[in-house]
Structure formats: C-alpha cells, structure tokens
UniProtKB/Swiss-Prot annotation:
Protein name: Proline--tRNA ligase
CDD domains, sorted: ProRS_anticodon_short, ProRS_core_prok
NCBIfam families: PRK12325.1 (NF008979), proS_fam_II (TIGR00409)
Organism: Wolbachia pipientis wMel
Gene3D superfamilies: Anticodon-binding domain, Bira Bifunctional Protein, Domain 2
UniProt keyword annotations, A-Z: Aminoacyl-tRNA synthetase, ATP-binding, Cytoplasm, Ligase, Nucleotide-binding, Protein biosynthesis
GO molecular function: ATP binding; proline-tRNA ligase activity
Length: 422
C-alpha cells in the first residue's frame, strides 16, 4: 500500500484526555477516532490490526472444533425475561423499544440468544458436545468509559458457548477452551495468566479470567512463580490448580504458598471463561434425552475474549517512547518501506513491486526525513526498509528491526529475498 494513497491521520501531540499509553498511541498512530464517549470509529490501520487478531482467534477456535455463527446485536427483551436476567442486569444494558413498543436491547452478551439457538434443535445426547462462537459487536453503557478501547461502551468480542449432556462433558469443554485461550494469547506474544475469578452477572460456579502482565493494568495478580514453567507445558489441570488469583480473590492470611514463592504483578484482563451448568438451560427449557433415556438440562459454558480491548492490551505490552511495537502476527503491515529522497524512487519502487503489497506500507510521500522516521516508529511496523542514497551508489538499503532498534545494511536483492522467503 502506498502511503500517498492511504488514509493515515496521525497526530504529533499527545491528546490531553488520553491518560494511558495505549489510548495515546491508538489516537496518535491513526488507529481510531473518538465519536462519542466510549465509542470509536476504527480507521484503516486499526481495522487491519483488528482483522489480524480475529484471524488468530478464528484459527485456534476452529482447530478446537468450535463452529462459527453470527448472532444479532439487537435482542428481544423477552428472552432475557425468560432467563430471569432482564431486571437484574442493571443500567449497563442499553434498553430500547421498536416501533411496535416491544422491549428490545443492544446485547451486552449472548447467553440467552445462544440457548434459544439450539433448544428447539438439539434434543439428544448424540447431538452433543457442541460449541458455537461468534465475533460480534456488543454494547455496555459503562458509567465512566475510559482508557480508549480498553474500557469502551461499544466493543468487539469473541464469545463462544458450549453445550454438553453432563458435568463431565462440560468440564472437558471448559478445559479445551482454557487450552485454546492459552494458544491464542501466546500467538500474540503474551504470557497469559489464568486466575480464578468471580462469575459476576454471567453466573455459575467455575470461572477463570485471563490477564496479561502490564504496569498499567487495573488488576493486581498474585500467582505461583511456577506458573510460567507450567504455561510452556500447557498442562491445563496443573495450571488451573496452581495458585493464581486477582486482588479481589486474594487473602494473605489463607494464601497457600509462601511469600518467596508468590509473584505480584499488575495485569490487564483480556478474556474470561465460565461454566454455569443449567443456569440458562433450565429456565429456558433447553434439554436433551440422555443415554439412559432421562430428560436432562443441557450443561453450558461461555467463553469471551475482548477483541478490540486486545488492541489496547497489545500496545500496553509492546511499546517504547517512540510508539507502538507490533508483534508480527498482529501488525497491520509487516514492513514499512521508506523512500528518503526523490533520486532513489526507482530503487524503492523496485523493492515495493517485488514484495507483497498487502504486507508493505510504502512511504512515498514528500515529507521530511524526520517526519517519515517518526511516523514509521509511531505506527510500529515490525520491519523498516530504508532506501537512501546508498541505494543508487552501492545498491544498499538499511533494514531496521523496530523491536530491537538494530539496523543492518543489505544489498537490495538480499533484502527482497530475505522478506520474500518469510
């Protein structure tokens, strides 16, 4: 993509209302534009990051055997009354009426819709287990939206719903999603910490939050220092049983491990999984015939990942004082190609044409060298190919690793071959 043909409205100065790094850089790097409190337009560069995060999630969810669907944003209140949650949910739910004066709502979550989706079709234990997921926009009317996409009112979420005939099957589904989440977050460059959590308004009796470590996190995490070692082994039962909790669940007096063994860090929540048995299937009459001929309520779980929130979390975890440092799998473009002067345009064009255009953002603008370098560092593409005067005199370009800052000279053909091979 040629920058001269692209829409990338970057900002030189830090917006006064943006308090944390991810919010500042999201605005400055031209990822988002605020439309109202907690509501944003996703600009082209930010949308590419969102799509890359979606692709990772979709790939791992599909590998787990989950099946993608798409449920409506606007839901009838009747389903929430049927489950008993309509009056309990509170002011976070945006309630509306249609032209027929029917009560509707903009979905903050989709347990009721998911239960309704299968209850008239899934009737036998032979139809289970089943796991459906979607990637869909949601709305929660936060009292104080803040921190940009980290705590917005409108947000993109991956939510999945598992259906099983009994507790044993439901626990297998839960453990499978736990393992899938570990894989998803590791692909994004994170060290995810799964902590025991309160079930909140979703309900149920088993729940884990997934956090990534970041100094600006809202939660304080307490976890056994063996956690990282177990994470590499992906031993789910050990990961679930090892001590790892957030501040609201930590009691120093009853903590089962010593202070020497206890790590304390700030974290950002990026995912949450729940097992809630028949909390929804019972009132909504979603049941199946079991293998022994009995009619039993379906055991359910739900599994959420904040997709748009992940953009902010990634920036919080991967940045420096110059800008964002995108991990390669989520970067909007892999390479930033910088043309430093008019007389090297032919060489820069040659490189651009030789590489995949959807992986390269080619700065072919007439701005100053300083502006070009600053903008490319700000938007944080993993690699920069810098085409200066040596490209003409010696057939040499500079290749910069954004994460390490290391700059290496390469012959033009060598650089083309290096990035074409990956």
């Amino acid at each position: 993509m040629r920058l001269s043909k692209y829409y990338l409205p970057t900002l030189k100065e830090k917006p006064a209302h943006a308090k944390i790094i991810s919010h500042q850089y999201s605005l400055r790097a031209g990822l988002i534009k605020q439309i109202a409190s907690g509501i944003y337009t996703w600009l082209p560069l930010g949308l590419l990051v969102l799509k890359n995060i979606e692709d990772i999630i979709r790939d791992e969810m599909n590998k787990s055997g989950a099946i993608e669907a798409l449920m409506p944003c606007v839901q009838p209140a009747s389903l929430w009354r049927e489950s008993g949650r309509y009056d309990d949910y509170g002011k976070e739910m945006l309630r509306i009426k249609d032209r027929h004066e029917e009560d509707m709502l903009f979905g903050p979550t989709h347990e009721e819709i998911a239960t309704d989706l299968i209850r008239d079709v899934v009737k036998s234990y032979k139809d289970l287990p089943l796991c459906l997921y979607q990637i869909q926009w949601k709305f929660r009317d936060e009292v104080r939206p803040r921190y940009g996409v980290m705590r917005g009112r409108e947000f993109l979420m991956k939510d999945a719903y598992s259906f099983d005939v009994d507790y044993e099957g439901a626990l297998n589904s839960y453990n499978l999603m736990y393992k899938t989440y570990i894989k998803i977050f590791k692909r994004m460059g994170f060290t995810p910490i799964g902590v025991g959590a309160d079930t909140g308004p979703i309900g149920g009796n088993l729940s884990h939050e997934f956090h990534i470590l970041a100094n600006t996190g809202e939660s304080t995490l307490y976890y056994d220092n063996k956690f990282s070692e177990l994470l590499e082994s992906e031993d789910i039962e050990s990961l679930k049983s090892i001590y790892a909790v957030a501040d609201d669940m930590h009691d120093p007096e009853t903590c089962p491990i010593s202070q020497e063994q206890l790590n304390v860090s700030k974290g950002i929540e990026i995912g949450h999984i729940f097992y809630f048995g028949d909390k929804y299937s019972k009132p909504m009459k979603a049941s199946v015939t079991s293998q022994d001929g009995k009619n039993v309520n379906i055991h359910m779980g739900s599994y959420g990942i904040g997709v748009s929130r992940l953009v902010g979390a990634i920036i919080e975890a991967f940045h420096d004082d110059k800008g964002i440092i995108w991990p390669e799998e989520v970067a909007p473009f892999r390479i930033g190609l910088i043309n430093l002067q008019t007389k090297v345009t032919e060489a820069a064009d040659k490189i651009y044409k030789a590489l995949k255009s959807d992986e390269v953002l080619y700065d072919d603008t007439e701005g100053s060298v300083g502006v070009k370098f600053s903008r490319m560092d700000l938007i944080g593409l993993p690699w920069q190919i810098i085409v200066g005067k040596k490209a003409v005199s010696e057939n040499i370009v500079e290749v910069k690793n954004r994460a390490t800052g290391e700059v290496k000279e390469m012959q033009i053909e060598e650089a083309i071959n290096h990035f074409s091979a990956k």
